[in-house]
Amino acid sequence: MSWPYATPGIPDEEFIRAEGVPMTKAEIRALALSKLRLIKGGTLVDVGCGTGTISVEAALIMGEGSKVYAIDKDPLAVEITKKNAAKFGVGDRLIVAEGDALELLPKLPRSNRYFLGGGGRELPMLFQTALELAGTGGVIVADVITLESLRLALDFLENAGVKYEIAQVYIARGRRLGGYTILSPLNPVYIITAYA
């Protein structure tokens, strides 16, 4: 299956999933991908790829000649990402690696686009490494859910003097209940965009 549209936001249900493997939801994914300012034929590194939704959509957007390097420490996430890459026809330009991101990042080909989809307490070190590797003009986007991760990221970016933007995104999806439509909220997400 390939995605026939030129816009991001493939419906969540189109992706292969596995219990315990996180997925960036369609609406958040569309915003994060727009913040990355992807380039045709470009390269992206996706840290903490989970089900590979960001990786797959980035590979589709950047098209032929592009490369996406997806990293996750969870072997199941790596397996699911590979399956989603094959399902959407981007397996030839999406390389998936299992391991610790801080160890793998310096070994990958350089990129000026990084997506940090996890990181927890390592988020400041991931930002630092990505900023160093991205070089001038690089864009690093992270999505975080917890206030603790947000604080860690903002403290690092402020202390490092890095230009950044932040947006809190709150999405509610409509669903039918007893003949009525109600809105069911997704978790609020903070999208942080840092510029190297």
From Swiss-Prot:
Keywords: Cobalamin biosynthesis, Methyltransferase, S-adenosyl-L-methionine, Transferase. It holds the Pfam family Methyltransf_31. Pathway: Cofactor biosynthesis; adenosylcobalamin biosynthesis; cob(II)yrinate a,c-diamide from sirohydrochlorin (anaerobic route): step 8/10. S-adenosyl-L-methionine binds at residues 24, 48-52, 72, 101. One of its GO terms (molecular function) is protein methyltransferase activity. InterPro entries: CbiT, Cbl_synth_MTase_CbiT, Cobalamin_biosynth_MTase, Methyltranfer_dom, SAM-dependent_MTases_sf. SUPFAM superfamilies: S-adenosyl-L-methionine-dependent methyltransferases. It is an enzyme of class 2 (transferase). The keyword Cell membrane does not apply. One of its GO terms (biological process) is methylation. It catalyses: Co-precorrin-6B + S-adenosyl-L-methionine = Co-precorrin-7 + S-adenosyl-L-homocysteine + CO2. The keyword S-adenosyl-L-methionine applies. Its EC number is 2.1.1.196. Belongs to the methyltransferase superfamily. Archaeal-type CbiT family. This is Probable cobalt-precorrin-6B C(15)-methyltransferase (decarboxylating). The lineage of its organism: Archaea, Thermoproteota, Thermoprotei, Thermoproteales, Thermoproteaceae.
